[in-house]
Amino acid sequence: MSNNQILFERAQKTIPGGVNSPVRAFRSVGGTPRFVARAQGPYFWDADGKQYIDYIGSWGPMIVGHVHPEVLAAVQRVLADGFSFGAPTEAEIEIAEEICKLVPSIEQVRMVSSGTEATMSALRLARGFTGRSRIVKFEGCYHGHADSLLVKAGSGLLTFGNPTSAGVPADIAKHTTVLEYNNVAALEEAFGAFGDEIAAVIVEPVAGNMNLVRGTPEFLNALRALCTKHGAVLIFDEVMCGFRVALGGAQQHYGIAADLTCLGKVIGGGMPAAAFGGRRDIMAHLAPLGGVYQAGTLSGNPIAVAAGLKTLQLIQAPGFYDALTAQTKRLADGLAAEARAAGVPFAADSIGAMFGLYFAERVPASFAEVTKSDVERFNRFFHLMLDEGVYFAPSAYEAGFVSSTHDDAVIDATLAAARRAFAALAA
């Protein structure tokens, strides 16, 4: 029995399912999860000492690679001064100033500890600001595990949303309307039917939790125009795509300003940190200035802020995103070429430092299209690549991530492994 198997059996005795987040359990792909012993640059090593090229990067944060020496040094410098204070620090101001500089639509920002906290707080703030209750979200977009966001579409536009998790009361789900991603007609119909009830529309402008699916410019511009017309708050959930698709995130890429933005992952540099921010007039409704309550014991934790601030400084290096975008595109295009050469139906896409792999004839534009991908073939490909020492997301419904440490040699090794994997799939 491998060390990974021993650890997984042991973990299941004290941790539900043996993991602290469901996707880590390998339920989608089968087999035994890899327990990570250490990581460096683009690699990690599991409990059995096997090395893997890592295309998860802690699900997005590790944009400069694992254990970057400057991030490590920044963390080490603050450790001796104390781990947590429950009081303000100058470093909190510095990271807030950096975020506001990089994302111009954010005039003020509040630090929290997780993406779920950020989206949950942004929705409460939008409701408090507008005095309305209804939230609009989109099928396939994931915004954390707050009750009002674990909702799927009802049988028709005007029906109540349905919970996607046990434990979510129908009375909460009924305030959330779920529409098809990238469907402008459905969006216009919804605003025409109940536009004056909508407190906020929350969207991943680049979705990463139904695999990688880009928002179309037409869809996102329609969102901006309709929210403005009807007085609804437009919330961009950039927890995943923020500082991933461009230095200024999806808002820079598309040239669209949100009213509120949720950030996470990269801004913590691998530490637990997230944030939400936006227009000053909306943020003024937050306590202690306004009546919308939000708080957190570990918000602005000095260790997380040190890692995040240094990461935000590193990604501003000249040419950083040009190189990262080109390398990610080289990976995606190379995988598609290897599949094509083997005669395996496959498509790939990339934007910035995010990529998507689809066992389908074309890149999907909605959750419904994503679900038509060949999941069984993806699962086989995942394990073939795992055996080769390449670690992709253990689910056909997750995006992948490239770091600045994924150099040409790493990409070459990945494509060589993929050539063998696709050949095995075609056999």
From Swiss-Prot:
Task: Give the pathway listed in the UniProt entry for this protein.
Answer: Porphyrin-containing compound metabolism; protoporphyrin-IX biosynthesis; 5-aminolevulinate from L-glutamyl-tRNA(Glu): step 2/2
Q: Name one GO biological process term.
A: protoporphyrinogen IX biosynthetic process
Main subcellular location of this protein, as a coarse class:
cytoplasm
Q: Which CDD domains match?
A: OAT_like
Its EC number(s): 5.4.3.8
Q: Which GO terms describe its cellular component?
A: cytoplasm
Catalytic reactions of this protein: (S)-4-amino-5-oxopentanoate = 5-aminolevulinate
Q: Does this UniProt record's set of keywords contain Ribosomal protein?
A: no
Point out residues bearing the modification N6-(pyridoxal phosphate)lysine. Answer: 265
Signal peptide start-end? none
Q: Which UniProt keywords apply?
A: Cytoplasm, Isomerase, Porphyrin biosynthesis, Pyridoxal phosphate
The cofactor(s) it depends on are:
pyridoxal 5'-phosphate
Fetch the Gene3D superfamilies from UniProt.
Aspartate Aminotransferase, domain 1 (3.90.1150.10), Type I PLP-dependent aspartate aminotransferase-like (Major domain) (3.40.640.10)
- Give GO terms: molecular function aspect only: glutamate-1-semialdehyde 2,1-aminomutase activity; pyridoxal phosphate binding; transaminase activity
**Annotated family:** Belongs to the class-III pyridoxal-phosphate-dependent aminotransferase family. HemL subfamily.
Recorded protein name is Glutamate-1-semialdehyde 2,1-aminomutase
